[in-house]
A protein has these predicted regions:
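Rossmann-like adenosine-cofactor binding region
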Residues: 21-103
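Residue-level "edge-of-site" marker
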Residues: 11-12, 54, 113
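Adenosine-phosphate binding glycine-rich loop
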Residues: 81, 86-178
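Conserved acidic E/D residue at the C-terminus of a beta-strand in Rossmann-like folds
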Residues: 8-11, 31
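Short alpha-helix immediately C-terminal to the canonical SAM-binding loop
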Residues: 16
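Short, small-residue-biased leader/transition segments that mark boundaries at the very start
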Residues: 1-7
Length: 178
């Protein structure tokens, strides 16, 4: 049997169109809504929850009722566990004891999943962050912020103030613009 993969369309439609183009008919994208989520989750052998709202807790999109409706022996992997998890039945586990059962569905909710492959994850993180660090080193922080909107967007604190709104809201702290 060939695997059937579904991705849910979120705010970034351009990115999902790109994925449609490069994967052809191997991946289906659908609009993210409760009905489509229920249809796909309850018919899946493997559900991978990957939800990120930068600086905030992940929304609980996979309810316990959906987990209950999954086939016995199916699996739920919650990649969002470091942000609180996107499943109501999710709880952090470790690489040493990675799985548990809820309603006969295997759950894998390991915190810091990249920690299982430290060399590879360090290499990947370095590849995506080195350019920003070099820009800051070459131009200084103020000029880097002005020159590169991505640098500005990635700053959480600046001159002693919390500048990332979602983090400030999550901790009930005051937010300041750069």
């Amino acid at each position: 049997l060939f695997p059937y993969t579904t991705l849910f369309r979120s705010i970034n439609h351009a990115r999902l169109r790109y994925l449609d183009d490069i994967t052809g008919s191997r991946v289906t994208t659908v609009m993210s809504n409760a009905a489509n989520l229920a249809e796909e989750v309850t018919n899946a052998d493997l559900v991978i929850g990957s939800v990120l709202i930068p600086g905030a807790l992940a929304p609980k999109l996979v309810s316990e009722d959906l987990i209950r409706q999954m086939r016995p022996g199916s699996a739920f992997v919650d990649i969002a566990i470091d942000q609180g998890g996107c499943g109501e039945t999710s709880r952090p586990t470790t690489h040493h004891d990675p799985t548990y059962l809820v309603h006969d569905v295997v759950h894998y909710c390991v915190s810091n999943m990249p920690g299982a492959v430290p060399r590879t994850s360090t290499y990947a993180l370095t590849n995506v962050t080195l350019g920003y660090g070099l820009t800051i080193a070459q131009k200084g922080i103020d000029a880097a912020i002005e020159a590169d909107p991505a640098v500005k967007k990635g700053i959480n604190t600046y001159r002693g103030k919390l500048t990332y709104k979602a983090v400030a809201e999550a901790f009930g702290m005051e937010h300041s613009e750069i």
